[in-house]
Design a protein with these regions (language model features):
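Hydrophobic helical membrane-anchoring modules
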Residues: 2-5, 181-315
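Residue-level recognition of specific faces of alpha-helices
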Residues: 10, 41, 65, 77, ...
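Residues in soluble alpha-helical coiled-coils and helical-bundle/repeat scaffolds
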Residues: 16-19, 101, 105, 173, ...
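Residues that scaffold the ATP/ADP-binding catalytic core of kinase and kinase-like folds
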Residues: 55, 171-172, 196
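Conserved catalytic core of Hanks-type protein kinase domains
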Residues: 59, 87, 113, 148, ...
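Acceptor/aglycone-binding surface of glycosyltransferases and processive sugar-polymer synthases
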Residues: 69-73, 77-87, 104-180, 201-211, ...
């Protein structure tokens, strides 16, 4: 099947995208038409509080190639992306954000590279990280922590933008994590993958606050690694050994001669270990929370409305 006859799906999400979505659709359509004569654009509204969805609905009325999936609330970027992939019907699927920081025009070159390298996933890799100093520092810290504590290695400055084959996406969707972290999951899929270096523009402020970045880091580590638990066990065993040694030393000192008071140092040690115990308990609580979310088996997201020129329904 030639590249111009293979069905192409372009998948994106909406969240406060009112300023960019109209231009994005225009550019995405043009980019898609250069790659395939059979395209669709699947847009997922992740509970956006602005008028982004209304703009897309106007496009749906004019172009049958565009469909809009409205989630019942904000479920999060990673879940919204997976909803879009679940509804994409193409032989090739191009996942990209709608904020125009990743140019849709990269699609044509990525399609050529995908065919040339014979891979199933070609993921974007930022040549240099955009954003403020704090964003860059927090980004580097995330990759450092994740690489140090996880069994899943992810490239630094990897983007969610990627061009994928149908079999790759079908395999990715077999993962049913209730709190998915997209990039590590995409690595776990396997299949031949390659990077596509690009420069990400900085057109708007990030919607990922520091708090959301910290939460995502904690979720990624506790979802994909048991190393923190192993480190806790090793540290506890080491402290227990040192405690036994120190206890023996105290007993010997007491038998040999008088013991001087040392309440200040004793309290410092007690407070330190109580604090350490609180940290360990909190970390274990995160793991228990992840287990609880999985066993409850709640839906990962809920689609409220599906809009297309052929279908307009509420679910």
């Amino acid at each position: 099947m030639s590249s111009m006859t293979r069905k192409l799906s372009i998948v994106t999400t909406l969240y406060r995208s009112m300023d960019t979505i109209d231009e994005f659709i225009q550019r995405a359509l043009a980019a898609g038409e250069a790659v395939s004569d059979d395209i669709e654009i699947v847009i997922v509204d992740d509970g956006s509080p602005d008028a982004s969805a209304n703009i897309v609905r106007n496009w749906v009325e004019r172009d049958a190639r565009i469909s809009l999936l409205r989630l019942s609330r904000n479920f999060g970027h990673h879940k919204a992306m997976l909803v879009g992939l679940e509804h994409a019907q193409g032989d090739l699927i191009f996942l990209i954000d709608s904020d125009l920081e990743e140019p849709p025009e990269l699609l044509s070159e990525m399609a050529q590279v995908l065919r040339g390298k014979a891979v199933d996933c070609l993921y974007g890799l930022q040549e240099r990280r955009k954003g403020s100093r704090m964003e860059r520092i927090s980004g580097h810290l995330f990759y450092w922590l994740f690489s140090a504590l996880s069994e899943v290695g992810i490239p630094q400055n990897v983007s969610t933008m990627r061009l994928m084959t149908r079999r790759y996406v079908s395999a990715l969707l077999k993962f049913r994590d209730k709190n998915p972290v997209f990039v590590p999951l995409s690595i776990l899929v396997g299949y031949p993958q390659a990077s596509f270096p690009f420069i990400k523009a900085s057109t708007s402020d990030t919607t990922y606050s520091l708090g959301r970045r910290i939460a995502l880091t904690a979720l990624a580590i506790t979802t994909f690694s048991a190393k923190p638990l192993i480190l806790m066990l090793c540290f506890s065993l080491m402290m227990a050994f040192l405690g036994i040694v120190y206890g023996g030393f105290v007993v010997v000192r007491a038998l040999i001669g008088p013991v001087q008071d040392g309440w200040a140092s004793l309290m410092a040690v007690v407070v330190f270990f109580f604090s350490l115990n609180a940290v360990f308990t909190g970390l274990m609580g995160l793991y228990v929370k992840q287990i609880l979310e999985e066993v409850k088996d709640r839906p990962r997201s809920i689609i409220q409305d599906i809009y297309s020129k052929r279908n307009s329904s509420e679910t």
